[in-house]
From Swiss-Prot:
The keyword DNA repair does not apply. GO terms for cellular component: cytoplasm. It comes from Hydrogenovibrio crunogenus (strain DSM 25203 / XCL-2). Induction: By heat shock. Residues 668-850 form the Lon proteolytic domain. Homohexamer. Organized in a ring with a central cavity. The gene is lon2. Disulfide bonds: none annotated. This is Lon protease 2. Gene3D superfamilies: 1.10.8.60, 1.20.5.5270, 1.20.58.1480, 3.30.230.10, LON domain-like (2.30.130.40), P-loop containing nucleotide triphosphate hydrolases (3.40.50.300).
Length: 878
């Protein structure tokens, strides 16, 4: 059930419809509040009458007689009050005598009850407060002690609800239950008010309530209609009805309102009502003060706005200031005069400037033209920074920022030397390729510092929208230029160093192919006339130096890769990592933690142990994480006061970093097992190849280890070559005819592919066929052809580093990779023994002992005799 407790709620759609349908008799009963005229003199006259009544005691008797007359009328009206009532439980708030409110009921829940009430001669029903959430399923214990008898006027049963006007008559209390479930019905009695006080006392209470009303009215205009109704219907002497009516207007809790309804002592009830009203006044005052402050702030802001507008208009009339359109046009014209625009850009700018002068500043086209001119005039047309081509200075900057990488530094210095001879450095596209954490991004920044150019970096990894490169067309809402135009604007020069990070991870989608869009940008023959879709004018990028980074070249499209000059950054060896940690990582981490070198020292042996046991990757990113973890562990002890300075030793690492993630790798010299060398995007690695014979009389060959197609083909070539040349390599010529061979590459969870393991697989198969392990610990790499030729492979530097890491000092490489090995720095070649093979015969001589043909034939014949005896025995048995 829903009913409305203030005049503002009467403005809802349902109540308006209900008021329209009310007949003339309802108007005579003063149910509609809107009939009262907003007349200030009426309120003043009522106030004057109240004051006169308080002063002149002679009127008290007359007022008492009026009250007696009113009570007589009430008794007459209530003489037909029923002994039993249908009850409407409500949970919103208690209903008070004297209230007249519209009520809306749920038809499904209360239609039976209302129909029974309508069928009776006088439409009486009881409204009583319940605490149950589901009030139409309330139990007798949920009902309050006291309810209100109401008279129903104009009940209307609609399609989904019932609407009626409820007029509160008097209090009732439940004496006995006739029906404890819906429709609720009970025998009731009607208690009388207890009047423990004189008429003067009650009248004083009435005046106090009226004064409270008068104090509340200026603070909350929502009470104006209720007050007019109040003044027209009640006087100060009618304290009983004043108390109930005043209580119905407060925002007190349901419990306090029900307590008022339960209170029969009139003096006590008036005290409680006054207390509630005083609280209502205090809350309303607080709300009024808050509202006043807010309105004052708003008024001040509005006043300032109007004054600014007036000032602006006055300044326009006096010629002291220009309007927005003129100001924008003058600003852009001033910028254009200072720029060295191309003829095409000048023509386009004049067209857009003409639009600025013609269009209304509020139109969308004006905003588009203004934004375009803003971008155009902020590009560095004809602005170039001076290159610093001092090679000595360049080498110092590179050495300061990076340890090792001498080949990369030399290549950068060569690039600068050519520029010094020409007097300028033309735009170039460099691609730095290497494992994560080897310093590709930092080298790009060092190149910019070396040249004295501005540096701008953005990542193209995961980029799928072509508009990120070449911008959006201006027809789109919120269109913006591409990344290269934004880079030129931020750098404010036309020859910055722009780094495209993670170019090997660029994507494509239905929105376009960013890699194809980069073809124009990264082509020295085309980027002198680069055209962004948003700008729609050509801009010269030929002086810009582009530096791209990638972990691998395999995923870069061929046409894009063809435009780049590739510089490989191989992984660091242990000695290089130690120097990087000592000179760069450790001091930087101490500074970030608020410590210094005197407080925490670390020995080179400790750094080496961290590298070999916890950070064996090609770069130094994970090494930095492990060193930072050590510093954090020690920082706790410094804060707790447990130490003032310390030196980290190898023995401290397991306690602080846990058990080592990596253990020393050992070469396996069992029969059929050979160590190979591999290259991945993470750097070089060793690769163990295992071959085993399954003893059956059936020929077969099986591969495992999650091998790619190319590696499977390499295995097939190795199998075919060894099987056809067993006699040549002094092995059993019929070995593969009677053996099912299984070739496995461990670490099966890691995908593997490539042709460089062909020689290693052939060596493992030959070891199995000869029943002989390789004669010394070594590692090898190379592609094998079907005729036994050893073909060149890539990643020689990474593979050499991987061999040094596991302690292998002897390697077999393809003869055509000799030049790649010779280019390696001396510190990588130191202590290494290299063999270069042109044919697999060279590999076999290095890996197996020389075996005479007679011994091999003797071994073969002995096996043949054993095989013949076994066959004869089987035939005899059968």
């Amino acid at each position: 059930m829903t009913y409305h407790n203030d005049s503002t709620d009467l403005e809802t759609l349902e109540i308006q419809e209900l008021e329209t349908e009310m007949d003339d008799s309802m108007h005579e009963e003063d149910i509609e509040f809107n009939e009262f005229v907003d007349n200030t003199s009426e309120f003043e006259e009522a106030e004057s009458n109240q004051q006169n009544e308080a002063i002149d005691g002679e009127h008290i008797a007359n007022d008492q007689s009026d009250m007696d007359s009113t009570m007589t009328q009430l008794v007459t009206a209530n003489s037909s009050k029923p002994d039993s009532l249908y009850l409407l439980p409500v949970k919103e708030r208690p209903f008070f005598p004297g209230q007249t409110l519209p009520i809306i009921l749920d038809k499904n829940s209360w239609s039976k009850t209302i129909k029974k009430v309508i069928d009776e001669k006088i439409h009486y029903i009881g409204i009583i407060y319940v605490e149950a959430d589901d009030h139409h399923k309330a139990k007798p214990k949920d009902f309050a002690k006291t309810g209100t008898l109401i008279r129903i006027h104009e009940p209307k049963i609609k399609e989904d609800y019932i609407q009626l006007i409820a007029e509160g008559v008097c209090r009732f209390q439940i004496a006995d239950w006739l029906s404890s479930s819906a429709p609720f019905r009970a025998r009731v009695n009607y208690p009388n008010d207890i009047r423990n006080g004189s008429p003067k006392e009650f009248k004083a209470y009435g005046l106090a309530i009226m004064n409270a009303f008068k104090e509340l009215l200026p603070l909350n205009p929502l009470y104006s209609e209720e007050l007019k109704y109040f003044l027209n219907r009640y006087s100060a002497s009618d304290s009983q009805h004043l108390a109930d009516f005043a209580a119905s207007l407060t925002a007190a809790s349901n419990e306090k309102l029900q307590d008022l309804l339960d209170t029969l002592d009139l003096s006590e009830r008036l005290e409680k009502v006054l207390s509630l009203f005083k609280h209502e006044i205090e809350v309303t005052k607080l709300q009024f003060n808050i509202r006043e402050r807010v309105e004052e702030n708003l008024s001040q802001q509005q006043r300032e706005f109007f004054l600014h507008q007036q000032l602006k208009e006055i300044q326009k009339e006096l010629g002291m200031v220009k309007d927005d359109r003129t100001a924008d046009a003058d600003l852009f014209q001033e910028r254009l005069d200072k720029l060295e625009l191309s003829e095409e850009a000048t023509k386009k700018a004049e067209e857009e400037l003409g639009k600025i002068n013609m269009l209304d500043p509020q139109s969308p086209e004006y905003g588009v033209a203004r934004n375009w001119l803003d971008w155009l005039t902020q590009l560095p047309w004809g602005k170039y920074s001076d290159d610093k081509l001092d090679l000595g200075r360049a080498r110092k900057i590179l050495n300061k920022g990076h340890d090792g990488l001498d080949d990369v530094k030399d290549r950068i210095l060569e690039f600068l030397a050519v520029g010094a001879l020409k007097g300028e450095i033309s735009g170039s596209i460099i691609c730095l390729v290497g494992p994560p954490g080897v310093g590709k991004t930092s080298i790009g920044r060092s190149i910019a510092d070396t040249l004295g150019r501005k540096f701008y970096r953005f990542s193209v990894g995961g980029m799928r929208d072509e508009a990120e490169i070449k911008g959006h067309r201006r027809t789109y809402i919120g269109a913006m230029p591409g990344k290269f135009v934004q880079a030129l604007k931020d750098c404010e020069t036309a020859n910055p160093v722009i780094m495209l990070d993670e170019i090997d991870k660029i994507g494509s989608s239905y929105q376009g192919d960013p890699a194809s869009a980069l073809l124009e940008v990264l082509d020295p023959e085309q980027n002198s006339e680069f055209m962004d879709h948003y700008m729609d004018v050509r801009f010269d990028l030929s002086k810009t130096l582009f530096v791209c980074t990638a972990n691998t070249l395999d995923s870069i499209p061929g046409p894009l890769l063809d435009r780049m000059e590739v510089i490989r950054l191989s992984g660091y060896i242990t000695e290089e990592k130690i120097q990087i940690a000592k000179h760069h990582l450790w001091p930087s981490l101490l500074e970030d933690a608020g410590l210094n070198k005197k407080q925490i020292q670390i020995t080179p042996a400790t750094i080496r142990h961290v590298i070999e046991g916890y950070a064996r990757e090609a770069g130094v990113r994970n090494l930095k994480k492990q060193l930072a973890k050590l510093i954090r562990k020690l920082a706790i002890k410094f804060v707790n006061g447990d130490m003032e300075q310390t030196t980290l030793h190898v023995n401290d690492l397991e306690e602080m970093l846990g058990q080592p993630r990596f253990t020393p790798e050992k070469t396996n010299q069992q029969m059929g097992t050979v160590t190979g060398l591999a290259w991945t995007s993470m750097g070089g690695a060793t690769l163990t190849i295992e071959a085993s014979r399954v003893h059956t009389l059936n020929r077969g060959f099986k591969l495992s280890g999650q091998l790619g197609d190319v590696m499977q083909e390499s295995a097939s070539i190795a199998y075919s070559y060894i099987a056809s040349n067993l006699d040549k390599y002094k092995a059993d010529p019929e070995f593969f005819d009677k053996a099912f061979v299984h070739l496995h590459v461990p670490d099966g969870a890691t995908p593997k592919d490539g042709p460089s393991a062909g020689v290693t697989m052939a060596t493992a198969l030959l070891s199995l066929a000869r029943n002989e392990a390789i004669k010394k610990p070594l590692a090898m790499t190379g592609e094998l052809s079907l005729t036994g030729q050893v073909l060149p492979v890539g990643g020689i530097r990474e593979k050499v580093i991987a061999a040094r890491r596991v302690g292998i000092k002897e390697l077999i490489l393809p003869d055509e990779n000799r030049k790649d090995y010779d280019e390696l720095p001396d510190y990588l070649k130191e202590g290494m023994t290299l063999h270069f093979a042109k044919h697999f015969d060279d590999v076999a001589k290095l890996t197996f002992h020389i075996r005479s043909k007679s011994s091999a034939l003797k071994k073969y014949l002995s096996k043949a005799v054993i095989s013949t005896e076994e066959k004869t025995e089987q035939e005899t048995t059968s």
